[in-house]
Amino acid sequence: MKIGIIAAMPEELKLLVEHLEMAKKHQRLGHVYHTGRIGHHEVVLVESGIGKVMSAMSVAVLVNDFKVTAVINTGSAGAVASGLEIGDVVVADRLAYHDVDVTAFGYDYGQMARQPLYYEASRYLVEEMKAV
């Protein structure tokens, strides 16, 4: 399994880049993609920039150009919850938009038109992450 790891800001990716073995750099669409290994995992690291559009663009490159089979978002992931400390790991089993409101058209808050309210995470990856 090749894992893509995406972070919005350099501070969120720095430690992972420092631990990357057999590291190579690749330029794509104005971003640097770092390939190599962390432990026994083949990984591709990228600082996407902040926001859903930047993140989506970087994930598209990870999937299309680098053929990753899983993507992990590292960093604050767009939110800071009380009670969480630096280094805590949050594993989501489902995700939803926090900034979408088309309730005037009969959708639930957080649901994009003609899309599910929740996006389910891979059960396999959730269980693997919980086992660590």
Region locations from a protein language model:
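Mid-sequence, gly/pro-rich, charge-dense loop/helix-turn segments that line enzyme active sites
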Residues: 80-132
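Short, active-site-adjacent cap segments at secondary-structure transitions
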Residues: 12-14, 78-81
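Proline-aspartate-enriched helix->loop->beta-strand connector
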Residues: 68-72
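N-terminal short beta-loop-beta anion/metal-coordinating cradle
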Residues: 1-66, 97
